[in-house]
């Protein structure tokens, strides 16, 4: 059985730990902070087998060097082949090698190209779990630091096509702030209203809202629903000074991301 555990880091990061029972060797996804990972490993008598990186930002990669030094064995470090990240031992290209096997894990690991937040951002799928870094958040998506709106929209559409029961393990607890924006642009979405109530209750108890699911995100995430009638109307009203005669899905998505950036 694959177990996935969250380690909290910094203000709102999640470092995900993957363990295939009964093995005591584990993998971590995007370890920005080595100290919390080491504490978790030692508290649970686990050995770090490898690291999975989604993109180059320091809050996702900052712990790699220390974890390599800490490990008694040479760590296998996977990451995108077209981003400059120190410590990667196995650069990945989703086109050349879309699937491979991890030691101590059952089943294949799938690699997806999801540029937008950064130019070389990748995501991983194993079993029914998606590790999407800063591409897809619950009720939101990542800022476009390097990629284009077209790239991000394509990446999100690719993720939205995964099976509905796929669990979404993003890298940040941004859900409540994302929901405020989602409700502003899609206020009459009952599924969104219900999810907001559940998420608020979870956070009041200091519980994670992650993982989400692809089914839930399809229903409530405005960035997966940029062509929804109410969302389009909200975009047109917010950007009332623009000519929306030929507003297509990409144009709507671009304006939606711009709106969120300044929300």
Curated annotation (Swiss-Prot):
Classification lineage: Bacteria, Pseudomonadati, Pseudomonadota, Gammaproteobacteria, Alteromonadales
GO molecular function: hydroxyacylglutathione hydrolase activity; metal ion binding
Binding site for Zn(2+) 1: 55, 57, 117, 134
EC number: 3.1.2.6
Domain of life: Bacteria
Species this protein is from: Shewanella baltica (strain OS155 / ATCC BAA-1091)
NCBIfam families in the cross-refs: GSH_gloB
Co-factor note (free text): Binds 2 Zn(2+) ions per subunit.
Name this protein carries in UniProt: Hydroxyacylglutathione hydrolase
Reactions it catalyzes: an S-(2-hydroxyacyl)glutathione + H2O = a 2-hydroxy carboxylate + glutathione + H(+)
SMART domains according to UniProt: Lactamase_B
Record's function text: Thiolesterase that catalyzes the hydrolysis of S-D-lactoyl-glutathione to form glutathione and D-lactic acid.
Alphabetical keyword list: Hydrolase, Metal-binding, Zinc
Annotated metabolic or biological route of this protein: Secondary metabolite metabolism; methylglyoxal degradation; (R)-lactate from methylglyoxal: step 2/2
Cofactor(s) needed for function: Zn(2+)
């Amino acid at each position: 059985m694959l177990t996935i555990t969250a380690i909290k880091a910094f203000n709102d990061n999640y470092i995900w730990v993957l363990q295939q029972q009964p093995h005591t060797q584990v993998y971590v996804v995007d370890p920005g902070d080595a100290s919390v990972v080491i504490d978790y490993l030692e508290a649970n008598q686990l050995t770090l087998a490898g690291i999975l990186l989604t993109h180059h930002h320091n809050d996702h990669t900052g712990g790699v060097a220390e974890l390599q030094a800490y490990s008694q064995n040479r760590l296998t470090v996977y990451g995108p082949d077209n981003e400059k990240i120190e410590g990667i031992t196995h650069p990945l290209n989703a086109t050349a090698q879309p699937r491979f096997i991890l030691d101590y894990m059952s089943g294949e690991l799938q690699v997806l190209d999801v540029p937008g937040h950064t130019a070389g951002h990748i995501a991983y799928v194993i079993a029914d779990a998606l590790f999407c870094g800063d591409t897809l958040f619950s009720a939101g998506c990542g800022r476009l630091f390097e990629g284009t709106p077209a790239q991000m929209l394509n990446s999100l559409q690719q993720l939205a096509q995964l099976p509905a029961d796929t669990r979404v393990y993003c890298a940040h607890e941004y859900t409540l702030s994302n929901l405020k924006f989602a409700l502003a642009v899609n206020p009459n979405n009952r599924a969104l209203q219900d999810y907001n109530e559940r998420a608020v209750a979870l956070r009041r108890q200091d519980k994670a809202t992650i993982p989400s699911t692809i089914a839930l995100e399809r229903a409530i995430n405005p960035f997966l629903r940029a062509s929804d009638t109410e969302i389009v109307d909200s975009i047109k009203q917010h950007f009332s000074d623009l000519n929306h005669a030929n507003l297509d899905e990409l144009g709507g998505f671009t304006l939606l991301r711009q709106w969120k950036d300044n929300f």
